[in-house]
Amino acid sequence: MPVYQYKARDRQGRLVEATIEAEDLRTAARLLRDRGLFVAEIKEPGKGLQAEVRIPALERGPGLKDLAIFSRQLATMLGAGLTLLQALAILERQTENRKFREILKQVRTDVEGGMAFSEALSKHKIFSRLYVNLVRAGETSGGLDLILDRLASFLEKELELRGKIRSAMTYPVIVFVFAVGVAYFLLTGIVPQFAQILTDLGSELPLLTRFLIAVSDLLRAATLPLLLLAVALFFAYRWYYGTPQGRRVIDRLKLRLPVFGNLNRKTAVARFSRTLALLLSSGVNIVEALDITKGTAGNSVVEEIVEAAKLKIQQGDPLNLTLAQHPFVFPPMVSSMVAIGEETGALDTMLSKVADFYEREVDEAVASLTAAIEPLMIIFLGVIVGMIVAGMFLPLFKIIGTLSVQ
């Protein structure tokens, strides 16, 4: 069945640009009018040079941002009194990501067929176990709009947290890559020319200069093998991290890195606290909540601690005791606040406070890390370039000094 592109306005005057499947143009226009849309433009899919080029492998799949926007908009529409099917139909039309639009279409079709919303979501990987369980809790309690609002806030905070971590990591990586590029250019393009000049002059070369010439010769002779080695090491790392033992070793190292380890630990505590608080406040029992939280930890060391806590709770021990046994990941303040929450029956509230505190800690850590890394990266770049320049010009200065004496 052909797919038609259209532009239309809804009853509120908002512009809607999307596609619709129909047998012909007349049917497509009628279907749009039945949806309450005022059609401004509708056209057949392009043919030949006008056809839209789509490469499935390069199309962006739905991500966390799409899910956060979907949750926020769905919560707003349900809170305004729209039915679930009406809200899903609207979101399906206005979603820009094509793959996510197809997912929403399948979800809407399943719900129309009598399937529970949570069950329809569970058929698609974009909706995590956490998401599906919270939606199920919302369906059971009759407060789906409130649950979706909490989910939207949770996903927005997670996006913000990831953005801060990414910003902290991006600058040093960019400077490092730039430094490597400059060093490669100097060593393979400039150093050989100086080496030829110095060889022709027949002067004795300092150790630093001989070292740079040796590195230059190696890079020019073995650039391709070195690139292949780097690619092989990358895939070897991916394979090793894919094994249970490798993931445990690398994840433990991530938590113990000199500078970034502290940031990773604070991020892990913030994510654990925020996720568990959301689940508990939505009515999920603590054993199931811990099991779901374990899957969102993103670090096998934290996953093992959460799994141990779940088993201890099943045996009758409180959560704070297990956390207190791992002060390197969960500081005493966390276990103490969890203990107070368990004693007062307000564990979800205490966990939210812990999450707020550690999200602020992450903010401060990222700010201080960025402030510290910037001058260090500039110094690093200066040392690399300065060492190469010094290695090349020292023999020239020596030759000039010898000639001036003569």
From Swiss-Prot:
CC per GO annotation = plasma membrane
Q: Which InterPro entries match?
A: GspF/PilC, T2SS_GspF/T4SS_PilC_CS, T2SS_GspF_dom, T2SS_GspF_sf
Record key words, sorted: Cell inner membrane, Cell membrane, Membrane, Transmembrane, Transmembrane helix, Transport
GO process terms (BP): protein secretion
Subcellular location(s) per record: Cell inner membrane
UniProt-listed Pfam families: T2SSF
Q: Does the keyword Membrane apply?
A: yes
Membrane topology reported for the UniProt record? Multi-pass membrane protein
- Tell me where the transmembrane regions lie: 69-91, 171-191, 211-231, 377-397
Specify where it is mainly localized: membrane
Q: Which residues form a coiled coil?
A: none
User: What functional role does this protein have?
Assistant: Essential inner membrane component of the type IV pilus (T4P) that plays a role in surface and host cell adhesion, colonization, biofilm maturation, virulence, and twitching, a form of surface-associated motility facilitated by cycles of extension, adhesion, and retraction of T4P fibers. Controls both pilus assembly and disassembly and plays an important role in PilB localization to the complex and ATPase activity.
Subunit structure as annotated in this protein's UniProt entry = Homotetramer. Interacts with PilB.
| Similarity comment text for this entry | Belongs to the GSP F family.
Query: What is the designated name of this protein?
Result: Type IV pilus assembly protein PilC
